[in-house]
Amino acid sequence: MKIIWYGHSCFEITGSDGTVIFDPYQEGSIPGLNKLHLKGNLVLCSHEHDDHNARDCVDVLPKEFKVEKIETYHDHHLGSRRGKNTIHILTYENMKVVHMGDIGCMIDDLSKIKNCDVLMIPIGGYYTIDTKEALEYINQIQPRIVIPMHYRSGDVGYDVLSTNEEFIKNRKDICYVKDVIEVNQETQKQTVIFEKPRN
């Protein structure tokens, strides 16, 4: 499968099973990113904020996928400040792909996502968990491939978010790619840093 990054928390998973879009953003909702025009078979949105719920930006030809959900919170206060958040667990080409959405809290039961193949996790803080908390999750989950998201990079992203610099300093298995990476059962354990969003 190929994983394409469109910036922020938006990814396209595409391959023999079809195309799934995670957390597409509304036009103008994120500094430095353009309007999305995507095609897919399923759109998964972690919550209903404009930078994660642009279903109308995706032309959908419906297809069924195996998707599990874990309901969490967007903050450390049981959702009282920013609401709820959904972790999506997609089974794709016999691999487990986990998108953490805008998770803003630590959860105890990680059994459904332990040792997943791909983990997409926010690191920018303020609206979500920060780098320290993300690293704690990674240590507990032990994913094969880690993809950080929801951080500031150059002119792209919210000013209040941290960059990925601290996160990179704490990872030893960095693999830099442009905006897409191909993943299969043989892909080695690594942390993927996308250099520039496709959008």
Question: Where are each of the predicted segments found?
Answer:
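Short secondary-structure boundary segments
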Residues: 47, 123, 149-151
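Charged helix-capping and loop-helix junction motifs
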Residues: 82-83, 130-139, 160-164
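Core dinuclear metal-dependent hydrolase active-site scaffold
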Residues: 1-42, 49-118, 126-133, 176-199
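Proline-aspartate-enriched helix->loop->beta-strand connector
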Residues: 40, 118, 134-151
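Accessory terminal helices/loops
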Residues: 144-145, 149-199
